[in-house]
Amino acid sequence: MAGGTVALGAVLAACGSDDDSSSSTTTDTGTTDSGDAMAADTSTDMFGKGDIGILNYALTLEYLETAFYADVIKSKLFKGSDQEAIIKFGSQEADHVVALTDTVKKLGGKPAPKPKTEFPLMNAPQVLKLASTVENLGAAAYLGQAPRIKSPEVLAAALSIHSVEARHAAALNTLLGKTIVPDGPFAKPAEAGMVLNAVQPFIIS
């Protein structure tokens, strides 16, 4: 592959370890800086009340990310170390699904059902752009729910996953020629309602 995808394997692999320090990344998802607005956002109530609803909202997003990477792997658009790195990304998203599912159950809730998804996978550059959008959105989504989470344990887990999503996004942003320098001292959160609207085109049922 030519251009920005040549170093995909090296860049993605470097950002994949949970032992790495957290990285911030820019987002272009229409986010807001208002913590009050985030705390007032009740869009996750459709998934359940309180922390369970927030966890199920996050679980739904992780379902989408896991399905996306699975489809990319099947597409064979990437080869060699590039494909291996994408497989690693997908594996980490699948681990998030397991962790969130287990947490919902431990809190006495019912995990959200897995939606059927469909993603446009036309060529490698387009897939990288879509992956960057998905990962930036995921990172912003977790941060957006931080003010609403009541349990310290759930908050710690959510921020840990947010860190991984941010590193995924930073790697993809680099390959797309976007700056790796954050556009401010604080990462930008995203309201659940906006995030759900953004991913709706990928959900077919």
Where are the regions that the model predicts?
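All-alpha RGS (Regulator of G-protein Signaling) helical domain and cognate RGS-like helical scaffolds
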Residues: G4, L8-V11, S17-S205
